[in-house]
């Protein structure tokens, strides 16, 4: 019984310390890097490579009104994805951005604006994620993503094995 009491007390203490540390974090509300976006010359080949060769299951895909695939997400881990989009003349092949999962978009954008970042408008994507973008001085785009329960990302995370 004494061992159980010590275990419970230690667990409660650990949770309290973790909560305190997170509340004092300079990046409070940032969950972590969520995805990397890549424009690819052949979407079917890229999906085949990432699913068959790399073993990353397809999480979801988004099509436009005419049925053309706009993007495919493959899932690396429960909360990490690779976003694949067809390359075009306007979107050449290569890595286009990285995505950062945030708990609350309003809080995250306010924090980054206060720090001097030029934060783009907040939108809701076709995947039902709430998005905003920041471009760093080197031209690298960071996509902030809040993932509500209705978002395809959150649904894929919940289905993860």
Which residues fall in each region the model found?
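Short hydrophobic/aromatic beta-strand micro-patches
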Residues: 39, 99-101
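Core segments of cupin and vicinal oxygen chelate
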Residues: 28-31, 37-81, 114, 122, ...
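Short amphipathic alpha-helices within nucleic acid-binding modules
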Residues: 48, 105-111
């Amino acid at each position: 019984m004494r061992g159980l009491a010590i275990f419970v007390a230690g667990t409660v203490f650990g949770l309290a310390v973790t909560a305190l540390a997170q509340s004092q974090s300079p990046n409070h509300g940032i969950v972590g890097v969520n995805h990397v976006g890549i424009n690819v010359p052949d979407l079917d080949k890229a999906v085949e490579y990432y699913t068959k060769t790399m073993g990353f299951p397809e999480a979801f895909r988004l099509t436009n009104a005419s049925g053309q695939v706009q993007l495919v997400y493959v899932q690396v881990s429960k909360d990490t994805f690779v976003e694949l989009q067809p390359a075009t003349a306007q979107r050449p092949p290569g890595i286009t951005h990285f995505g950062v999962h945030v708990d609350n978009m309003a809080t995250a954008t306010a924090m980054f604006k206060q720090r001097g970042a030029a934060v783009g408008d907040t939108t809701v994507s076709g995947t039902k994620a709430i998005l905003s973008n920041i471009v760093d001085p080197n031209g690298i785009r960071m996509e902030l993503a809040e993932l509500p329960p209705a978002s395809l990302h959150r649904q894929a995370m919940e289905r993860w094995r």
